Curated annotation (Swiss-Prot):
Catalytic function, reaction form: (S)-2,3,4,5-tetrahydrodipicolinate + NAD(+) + H2O = (2S,4S)-4-hydroxy-2,3,4,5-tetrahydrodipicolinate + NADH + H(+); (S)-2,3,4,5-tetrahydrodipicolinate + NADP(+) + H2O = (2S,4S)-4-hydroxy-2,3,4,5-tetrahydrodipicolinate + NADPH + H(+)
Protein's name according to its UniProt entry: 4-hydroxy-tetrahydrodipicolinate reductase
Function: Catalyzes the conversion of 4-hydroxy-tetrahydrodipicolinate (HTPA) to tetrahydrodipicolinate.
Entries under InterPro entries matching the protein: DapB_C, DapB_N, DapB_N_CS, DHDPR_bac, NAD(P)-bd_dom_sf
Enzyme Commission number, as recorded: 1.17.1.8
Annotated GO CC locations: cytosol
Binding site for NAD(+): G10, P11, R12, G13, R14, M15, G99, T100, T101, A125, P126, N127, F128
Organism whose genome encodes this protein: Bacillus cytotoxicus (strain DSM 22905 / CIP 110041 / 391-98 / NVH 391-98)
Gene coding for it: dapB
GO terms assigned for molecular function: 4-hydroxy-tetrahydrodipicolinate reductase; NAD binding; NADP binding; oxidoreductase activity, acting on CH or CH2 groups, NAD or NADP as acceptor
UniProt family annotation: Belongs to the DapB family.
Amino acid sequence: MKDIKVIIAGPRGRMGHEAVLLMERTPHFQFVAAVDYKHGGEKISDLPGMPALDVPIYEDLHTCLDEIEADVLLDLTTPEVGKKHVTLAVEHGLRSVIGTTGFTEEELQHLTNIAKEKEVGTIIAPNFAIGAVLMMKFSQMAAKYFQDVEIIELHHDQKLDAPSGTAVKTVDLIRQHREPKQQGHPNETEQLKGVRGANVDGIHIHSVRLPGLIAHQEVLFGGDGQMLTVRHDSFNRASFMSGVKLSIETVMNLDHLVYGLENIMD
């Protein structure tokens, strides 16, 4: 396979650190630069806990793109920064793989339009874990037969957005096979505001944030005399790297935006 030159935005985060290790152990990935606003002008090898890689770090993506030739931007920053980075990458004609969440439908549509116009491959993945993608697909299948469903998503207490992108994507998939309906007793009231969670077309979403967690989700389907639970657990960030690798390899052959890892899996 032809070598793929990769820029990583957000190398100091836990996902970013795993991605750096992925670059190091994947022969056809060339780690050419990183973007980190706190460590511009340094090398990856200067960062604590990083491998001894002579890879330059830039303070901002704009400067990096002016000086570095790359094939793919891998963005593992925050929702706010990730939105700016993917827009800049598409405008520069650079393929990108985005692991941040929090995009609105309007923002996704805008990015879809400009990626199509520029013919630039872009992948936005709410979750890179292959098992999580299968969990979402299984939930979509189950929704054909179980109309009553609730979602509980659990993440570490440093996660910035709620509900998670995975939960939002799961709801989108379920809604393809489920008409909006009121779930629970029609006269149900909340004695404590928000206790029933967010409500999307009658699907309740509950977000848990605690130390010790990484990324977990369970989708509960209820029926007469039975219950089906579909659950996925990521116990460390290494669980996401197979999806990151697949996305980087796949985006090289795209000329448009793809939202969701399930859309590039056979």
